[in-house]
């Protein structure tokens, strides 16, 4: 199959689709995909039809959702249509709300009614569902790479499901996506014949066997074992496709019901002047990946500094940012540019150096930019002053410079915070707003104000700077 985006044409002209689905209004549109609400003619089920114009995003999303079929906290793909010279069309379950809408509603309630926005029990239940979904990805060595509230969809009965896998990367080989150009539709069945609901109790991940998409049980993996396996995968050069050779922001700027929301990345499509050139950096024969993925506010330091050798840990940082936003109803690091993003992280965690992250000096952009020493970092506790020590301790396990120090999803699910009083509320007691977040509402803090700034330069707003030539280019120092 040609790996160039197919010519876009209306989904209404596809006979194999209109024979099975009654297509209603378009509910989302972007540069690389359109989403329609539709009804399955055989049983009246309301679904979302996602037509993807970009080969890379389509391949990734189909591959990941096929592997994760049956995971209770991952969006369901019922089937998909994909032929030579045609756009892929995914048939997804229709979910009308997302976590960004929940956070926005919580912020409104806090302003009108006072209080904290969410109860501790509500936050715990949301986090358990998020962690369970990400754990399913990581058990199958799938890196989502764009975790944020707008990509966490919610059913009417409170079940949260991860969505928008257009930037996902699979760190192991799967032969999932069919390549027969004569075949029109590929149907997926749930493993047990129906969609399972998430458990009302916290899963015992330490003692339960791990199960992959093939149904085979796997032993629980320690953190050391995980890192060993990832290094082996990199050494064996099993990252098989070349889809990271382009900037992977395709689904980041699309607003779609049941799939994704408008991203803050739309002013950041190009790489800034100090960033590692991912187009030149990515060498699939060496198992490298692009650093230009994910939404900036949730992007970890290793990506901000241009790393192309990373793993599941990038999702763990993003999880920490989502957790912090649930707690405070504000984004933790709402950077207006990549430099501003690094600056905000530095002001909270302190300067990045070998002491806090051994090996950080080898990051592609580490020597290209530096900030004055932060004498008194704000710290996570400074960002969330009204929260308990247990909450701060949990966040610090995710929001830390060294990727190897971040807690895995398994460790997070077994943390005492999630099992002690006050207990997580039942899923049925979670309030779900009737609609999902609209454009530019993925995180609530005045994003439109940021976008109205006169210049999109990463260097504006920082005052004086020192640019020094070096043998390999230049460095930028901010006082």
Swiss-Prot record:
Q: Where is the composition biased (Polar residues)?
A: 468-479
Residues binding ATP: 27-35, 50
Domain of life the protein comes from:
Eukaryota
SMART domains documented for this protein? S_TKc (SM00220)
Instruction: Respond yes or no to whether keyword Transcription regulation is given for this record.
Output: no
What is the reaction catalyzed? L-seryl-[protein] + ATP = O-phospho-L-seryl-[protein] + ADP + H(+); L-threonyl-[protein] + ATP = O-phospho-L-threonyl-[protein] + ADP + H(+); [DNA-directed RNA polymerase] + ATP = phospho-[DNA-directed RNA polymerase] + ADP + H(+)
Q: Which Pfam families match?
A: Pkinase
Kindly state the tissue distribution recorded for this protein. Highly expressed in suspension cell culture. Expressed at low levels in all plant organs.
Q: List, in alphabetical order, the Gene Ontology terms for molecular function in this entry.
A: ATP binding; cyclin-dependent protein serine/threonine kinase activity; protein serine kinase activity; protein serine/threonine kinase activity; RNA polymerase II CTD heptapeptide repeat kinase activity
Q: Which PANTHER family match?
A: CELL DIVISION PROTEIN KINASE (PTHR24056), CYCLIN-DEPENDENT KINASE 20 (PTHR24056:SF171)
This protein is called what?
A: Cyclin-dependent kinase F-1
The protein's organism comes out as: Arabidopsis thaliana
């Amino acid at each position: 199959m040609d790996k160039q985006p197919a010519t876009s044409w209306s989904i209404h002209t596809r006979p194999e689709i209109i024979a099975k689905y009654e297509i209603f209004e378009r509910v989302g549109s972007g540069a690389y995909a359109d989403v329609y609400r539709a009804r399955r003619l055989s049983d009246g089920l309301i679904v979302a039809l996602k037509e993807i114009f970009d080969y890379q995003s389509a391949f990734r999303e189909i591959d990941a959702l096929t592997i994760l079929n049956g995971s209770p906290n991952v969006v369901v793909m019922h089937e998909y249509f994909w032929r030579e010279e045609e756009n892929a069309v995914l048939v997804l379950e229709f979910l009308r709300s997302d976590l960004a809408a929940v956070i926005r509603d919580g912020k409104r309630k806090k302003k009108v009614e006072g209080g904290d926005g969410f109860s501790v029990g509500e936050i715990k239940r949301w986090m358990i569902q998020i962690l369970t979904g990400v754990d399913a990805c990581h058990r199958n060595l799938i890196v989502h790479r764009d975790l944020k509230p707008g990509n966490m969809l919610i059913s009417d009965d409170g079940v949260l499901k991860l969505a928008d896998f257009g930037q996902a990367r699979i760190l192991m080989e799967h032969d999932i996506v069919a390549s027969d150009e004569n075949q029109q539709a590929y149907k997926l069945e749930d493993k047990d014949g129906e969609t399972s609901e998430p458990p009302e109790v916290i899963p015992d991940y330490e003692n339960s066997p791990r199960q992959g998409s093939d149904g085979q049980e796997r032993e629980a993996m320690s953190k050391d074992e995980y890192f060993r396996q990832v290094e082996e995968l990199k050494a064996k050069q099993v990252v098989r496709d070349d889809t990271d050779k382009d900037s992977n922001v395709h689904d980041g700027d699309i607003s779609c019901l049941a799939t994704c929301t408008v991203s803050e990345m739309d002013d950041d499509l190009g790489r800034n002047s100090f960033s590692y050139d991912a187009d030149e950096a990515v060498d699939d024969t060496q198992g490298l990946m692009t650093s230009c993925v994910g939404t900036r506010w949730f992007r970890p330091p290793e990506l901000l500094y241009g790393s192309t050798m990373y793993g599941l840990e990038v999702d763990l940082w993003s999880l920490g940012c989502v957790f912090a936003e649930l707690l405070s109803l504000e984004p933790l690091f709402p950077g207006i540019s990549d430099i501003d993003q690094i600056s905000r992280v530095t002001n909270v965690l302190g300067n990045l150096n070998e002491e806090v992250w051994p090996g950080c000096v080898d990051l592609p952009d580490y020597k290209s930019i530096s900030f004055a020493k932060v004498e008194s970092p704000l710290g996570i506790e400074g960002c969330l002053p009204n929260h308990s020590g247990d909450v701060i301790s949990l966040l610090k396990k995710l929001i830390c410079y060294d990727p190897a120090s971040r807690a895995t999803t398994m460790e997070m699910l077994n943390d005492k915070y999630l099992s002690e009083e006050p207990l997580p509320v039942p899923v049925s007691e979670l309030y779900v707003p009737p609609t999902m977040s609209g454009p530019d509402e993925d995180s609530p803090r005045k994003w439109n104000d940021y976008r109205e700034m006169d210049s999109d330069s990463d260097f504006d707003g920082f005052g004086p700077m020192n640019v020094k030539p070096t043998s390999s280019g230049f460095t930028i120092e901010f006082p």
